[in-house]
C-alpha cells in the first residue's frame, strides 16, 4: 500500500492547471538550453527492466510520437514547483541501505525514502499526471561531479534540454550540470535507451554528492 506521504504529495502536486491551460505560444524571458547529442541504441538499465516488471503500465505503451514541452512561464513554474516539492519531500537514502542489495531498485517513494532514481521517477510521474507529455520526460544516466553513477530526469522542451536533479533545486540546462551524460530513454519508446556518448557540460561552481 502506498504511504500517506506518497498519496498526499501526489494529490498535492497534480492539483491545479491541466496541460491544455499552458500549451501556449513561447514567451520572452524564459531560459534557453541546447539539445544533448543523441547516438544509437544503448543497453537498458537493469533497474528500468525491474521497474517495468512491477509497473507494466509504464512500459507497454507501444510507439509514441515524439513531443517536446512547450516552455511558457506557467509550464516553467510547474516544473520548478514539482522539482522543489519532490526534492524536499523524499528522505535521501542509498540503494544498499534502502533495499539491502547492490542491484539498482527503481520505484516510487512508497515509504517516503529513496535515492536519485526514486526522485527522478516520481518527478516524471507527477509531471505526467499534470499533463506533460511523457515523450519529453526522459530518465537519464550520468556520472556526477564525483564521477559516480547518478540518475536525473531530462525534460525536452522547445527551448532545449533541461535537467531535474535531486542534488539541485535549480533546474539547469544539461550543459550547466558538469555531468557526463551516458544514456537516456528514447522519446518514441521508453524501453529503448539511446547513447549520449559521455557528453559533458561546463562544470558549475560547486560540487554535490549523490
Briefly describe each language-model feature range.
Residues 1-10:
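Bacterial N-terminal signal peptides that target proteins for export
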Residues 2, 24-210:
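A structural boundary/capping signal
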Residues 9-19:
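Bacterial N-terminal signal peptides
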Amino acid at each position: 500500500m502506498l504511504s500517506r506521504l506518497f498519496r498526499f504529495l501526489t494529490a498535492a502536486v497534480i492539483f491545479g492547471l491541466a496541460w491544455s491551460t499552458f500549451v501556449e505560444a513561447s514567451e520572452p524571458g524564459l531560459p534557453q538550453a541546447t539539445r544533448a547529442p543523441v547516438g544509437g541504441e544503448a543497453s537498458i538499465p537493469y533497474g528500468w527492466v525491474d521497474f517495468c516488471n512491477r509497473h507494466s503500465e509504464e512500459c507497454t505503451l507501444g510507439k509514441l510520437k515524439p513531443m517536446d514541452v512547450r516552455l511558457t512561464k506557467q509550464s516553467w513554474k510547474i516544473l520548478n514547483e514539482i522539482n522543489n516539492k519532490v526534492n524536499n519531500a523524499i528522505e535521501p537514502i542509498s540503494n544498499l541501505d534502502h533495499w539491502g542489495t547492490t542491484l539498482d531498485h527503481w520505484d516510487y517513494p512508497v515509504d517516503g525514502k529513496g535515492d536519485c532514481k526514486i526522485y527522478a521517477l516520481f518527478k516524471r510521474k507527477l509531471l505526467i499526471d499534470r499533463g506533460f507529455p511523457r515523450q519529453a520526460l526522459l530518465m537519464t544516466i550520468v556520472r556526477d561531479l564525483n564521477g559516480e553513477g547518478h540518475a536525473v530526469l531530462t525534460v525536452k522542451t522547445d527551448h532545449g534540454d533541461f535537467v531535474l536533479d535531486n542534488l539541485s533545486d535549480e533546474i539547469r540546462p544539461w550543459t550547466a550540470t558538469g555531468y557526463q551524460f551516458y544514456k537516456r530513454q528514447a522519446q518514441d519508446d521508453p524501453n529503448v535507451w539511446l547513447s549520449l556518448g559521455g557528453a559533458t557540460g561546463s562544470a558549475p561552481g560547486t560540487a554535490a554528492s549523490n
